[in-house]
Amino acid sequence: MDNDGAAAEVRTVALDWARAVVSDDADRIAAFMAADWVMVSATGIATREQFLALVESGDLTHAAMTAASEPRIRVYGDTAVYIARVTNTAHYRGRRHDADEWTTDVFVRREGRWRRVASHVTDVAPG
């Protein structure tokens, strides 16, 4: 597959991931994650297990997740890097959080499927 085709696949997977996150269905979300997936944010590193446990318990829910910029996708063989500005509305332990973030996701193609292995979020600077 050429890089354009692979980039289109990654774009589709990223959109499907956003829909899965908003569904608040831990099994559906897990289907997009590699077993060793981690998320890096201002608070540190969260593992796949930690993230999914928050979703399963209902402590973390999402009402919206929308791309706010055209993504930048680069494919390097069976690895892809996806960067986009994303807005989302989440509730964490009952408190609403509206976020405007730059996200970087690293995907690896395994057994013909693109899976997230790492995600990093950075708040967009005000102004």
Where are these regions (language model features)?
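A beta-strand edge to alpha-helix "cap/lid" segment located at domain peripheries
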Residues: 1-127
